Amino acid sequence: MKRALTSVVLAPRNAAIAVISLYRRVVSPIYGDVCRYYPSCSAYGLEAVQEHGLVHGGVLAAWRVCRCHPWAEGGIDDVPARRVQQYRRTRLGFVVAPSHGKG
């Protein structure tokens, strides 16, 4: 029951991850490597949402996009690490409840 509830709670986060991933695969290659920061803004947004959730990660990503403009100095700008990892990431980047080994 708890695992099902966790999946429901994580659904909006995973929906945002799917949208950002789709953008990275379809739209981002059209523009090429134009971001002044490393990782790129879309990679930063993806990691921020994976790491911090939809609201806090979305705010971090929006702030990053606002800072990325032609006159920005750029450089390395990693997503702030979370103190405690609550969830794990799948191979496709979605966030799921941690699996606990049973025996």
UniProtKB/Swiss-Prot annotation:
Keyword hit for Membrane: yes
Keywords, comma-separated and alphabetical: Cell membrane, Membrane
Gene Ontology cellular-component terms listed: plasma membrane
Location within or outside the cell: Cell membrane
Membrane topology: Peripheral membrane protein
Position of the signal peptide: none
InterPro entries: Membr_insert_effic_factor_YidD
Keyword Lyase tagged: no
Source organism, top-level taxon: Bacteria
Family indicated by similarity: Belongs to the UPF0161 family.
HAMAP family membership: UPF0161_YidD
Function of the molecule: Could be involved in insertion of integral membrane proteins into the membrane.
UniProt-recorded name of the protein: Putative membrane protein insertion efficiency factor
UniProt organism field: Clavibacter michiganensis subsp. michiganensis (strain NCPPB 382)
Lineage of the species this protein comes from: Bacteria, Bacillati, Actinomycetota, Actinomycetes, Micrococcales
